[in-house]
């Protein structure tokens, strides 16, 4: 037996009744909301926006609601003329005017929602009302908790079949409401589906002014609601026993009914010898009882075991009552789920002695039973109106008993009919019964056809369509309305509205028909030819559907899929964060970018520039529109000025808000218990009244100027969206930066990964002739984003197979060439997807491409992109990023309860994990060494957080006494293991001959120091004749060079060039070899040594491939060191390409190489090409901006001008890097400059021949 608990938690509270002011809303449908159930209710976009607008001050953080509210301008009174007209014509209720021009909730309603939330929290937590109020006074109410309102049933639409009157007739109409909360919202681009959670009952209390708390300030859509939180049920055990008995009988009756009904349906499919056990195991069987059930109820007036022939030919399916009950029981999957959930709740209550049935559970079972089982709405309303608990218990038992009796009578009547029809009736009587059934069905169908609502004549549908406006705002000359569109220039209205029996068509075609009829004429981004092609395909679909065999042919399915995809594209739907272009908040956008990413000022500048251009275009467009309207008004005929002015006013007002015509939707199925489709009625009526105007604008080619339908969300067509490529090493934030850009602009974001794509059809789509053809990735991205101006990230564009990558299959096309049209601002406004077959405007899409090695791309594609290079981060930047972004994110991801407070939203994170700067710097240098980005750095921080999460849980479980949130350097080996080898091993040691330090740019985007080791062997020593030929240099076969270390072809060629240049220096007698000899002897000695020298050069870390020309000067200096037998100082690193004339050419990756030199403790001086100083000036200015300091633009200009001189005088750049990295910078324009920096000039070069150096200078 179950245990009963009459003392609920609510009884501990001293005051269980409250009166609060709540916003109210009256449904348009006959839906009745019972507490404890979640309802999915479908609204038109306008109605949903009007309802949510009342809470706009509390839901500003919910993006989907903000996007919906941006479609309508409820602040101005001239934007909803047609909505006002339709509401007055259809609703005819003064209390519904607030849905036309809604207002925000009053302060009294705000306090009412707070008080209700406090009471509700106290009841949920079991702490009582008083403790619940105290505990929630300082807690912030979440966004969706504010969406609390009182739902008033629509009594006019709930009919009582016994009295044939509505529930609102008479003076005894109930004042009971359902207090509900909006807990979910889904935007399907046509309608809005709100999920309502019914919480409790309430009673409307008339505000007579005596109550000072609610004396003033209430609005027409607000009401004082009395709520009783007392859930004490007298004689709980007895009442639950009665409810349990009735529910068992009812569930057995339903289960047996479903079994018999399915047997009747499956008569032609199943063998007549199948028994009830097999039927219980069929798919979709809503079986509630384990084992067989032989009765509908306890009524035994019929035969429990009828004849097998009679049972196999059951006439149950001919009974209208049986059909109605069956459709309600198995008509939707959501009902199945709810039905099984109700059964599970009852089984949990009655199983075991440890489970306690309390008052709240019992009352919830009462409401759930009424809400889920197939009771009519007038009975559900009656149960809702039973505010007293005892009366509610009596009513639910009576309702269940009536339903049990209905199932019993149905079985008795069916058994009688089966027995008579199969055993006693003659063939003539059977035929008569069947004929009467068919006649009744035919009469019913004829009645349904006659009673169908007559379509209004759109040419005479009221003021909204009496004077349709053309696209330029002008009104056409008056003419008889019957000949309004018979000029023949663009066809007739029958092209879009030529089917008066659209309701008789296929259910699958209704949504397509609504799109063709109502939405397609209003699409401004489609040309007339494109609309003609779509309309032609639609006619083919209708012809195929109406042909013999229906839609069974393949052409029908291909065309239907095509039209469904065309319908799903968000035509003319533009989403933005700002109300209008002129209202763009540049500071807010800049703050959003700064909050998401550190540094990257050059990228942020480009986006701010784009927003500034949009803002200026919005301001100028408003001025131009005002001037144009004034000029048109002055040029009009004065006799028609008044009417034209009114027409223009209406046209302008409609252009400021998104037309609800686009909100027409096909009926959506119910989600949990009931989905209310009648909420879209107003939107459908509005679409009908404006259909004629839309068709006129779509077909009339009067003006080519596009007038935006919603100035607040549609960007200017005169401005092309930027097409940016972010080029940089992995892990530098390119992908996340693209997401931040979309967030700053308030646009939807879509990512397309292009890595490995080798088929052109992936970009352009497949032609419809192929089986399973689909649009390309770009059209699919538009469908997913639900707007025509998203931010689309083309990730890894340099890894597209094709173009310069090689290996492309000619039969599949070149996908990189297909991107040329997409990424060209002058062409992408007419991008043609092979599947669609007509142009699509992509000019408002912001394309952001990412690449690691952009030079792998084809030159035409690279020329179309605005490339912004993102370099590697130095460890100071990584330190700031780790403290400000990565560590707080990892702490939150690993489950620590951090509160978002403070300047950087770090909250109380130091209570859980605290890492000082030295420890974090050690993680960067020792555990993520050589990384250009911060990806591995974040992984390491995540590892630290996971270790600390384990310790924190052990402390919570009291397994350890204390929890220490601090992580110092000594803890890193415990958590992260042994650090990586530093890589400085090869650079350590004493100064050696032929050992020179070079700088490299690694494939991961980082920089490092490479050691070039050269050893020379004099062949004269091995032959024993060092003084061969008296030192005239004529002996030997020339120097030989052998290079190892997995070197590339370009690097090996640079080494040979360097060696040849050393030889040219010997021939020109520039080098000094022996101070005791004259110049000629000096040259002969050097040449003789050179010709008998075998040089072997090796670059350590042989497993790593190395290539590039930037090591030319390094290898040349190494060879010269071996030849002159002079060591090179170990604190110098250099980079630069060398030519045969000794000129040092500029190289790339200077910043990364500078960082690599800085991370090596032995390097104090760095030699770079002279031409690379301008790169250092650029990096210097960028570093100043990213550090947040004010950049002196006059100084930058002075630095650039000073750099043009051979001997520059301004050294701010060198001083900056000396202070920041501890590296002294030297510049070399030719190889002789390197010799002067490394060695003493007098020791290496001959003074007599110094003047000859000018011959080789450039």
UniProtKB/Swiss-Prot annotation:
Known catalytic reactions: Hydrolysis of proteins in presence of ATP
Start and end residues of each Lon N-terminal domain: 22-404
Keyword annotations of the record: ATP-binding, Hydrolase, Nucleotide-binding, Peroxisome, Protease, Serine protease
Biased composition (Low complexity): 270-285, 641-655
Binding site for ATP: 728-735
GO molecular function, one term: serine-type endopeptidase activity
Biased composition (Basic and acidic residues): 484-495
Keyword hit for ATP-binding: yes
Pfam families xrefs: AAA, Lon_C, Lon_lid, LON_substr_bdg
Top-rank lineage group of the source organism: Eukaryota
InterPro entries per UniProt: AAA+_ATPase, ATPase_AAA_core, Lon_lid, Lon_proteolytic, Lon_Prtase, Lon_prtase_N, Lonp2_euk, P-loop_NTPase
Span list, region Disordered: 270-296, 447-503, 627-670
Example GO biological process: protein targeting to peroxisome
A GO-annotated cellular component: peroxisomal matrix
Chain ranges of the Lon proteolytic domain: 990-1241
Membrane-crossing segments per the record: none
Compositional bias annotation for Polar residues: 459-474, 656-670
Main location, first listed in the record: other
Catalytic residues as annotated in Swiss-Prot or TrEMBL: 1110, 1153
UniProt keyword annotation of Transmembrane helix present: no
EC identifiers of the protein: 3.4.21.53
Localization annotation: Peroxisome matrix
Annotated family: Belongs to the peptidase S16 family.
Role according to the record: ATP-dependent serine protease that mediates the selective degradation of misfolded and unassembled polypeptides in the peroxisomal matrix. Necessary for type 2 peroxisome targeting signal (PTS2)-containing protein processing and facilitates peroxisome matrix protein import.
Protein name (database record): Lon protease homolog 2, peroxisomal
Organism, scientific name: Candida albicans (strain SC5314 / ATCC MYA-2876)
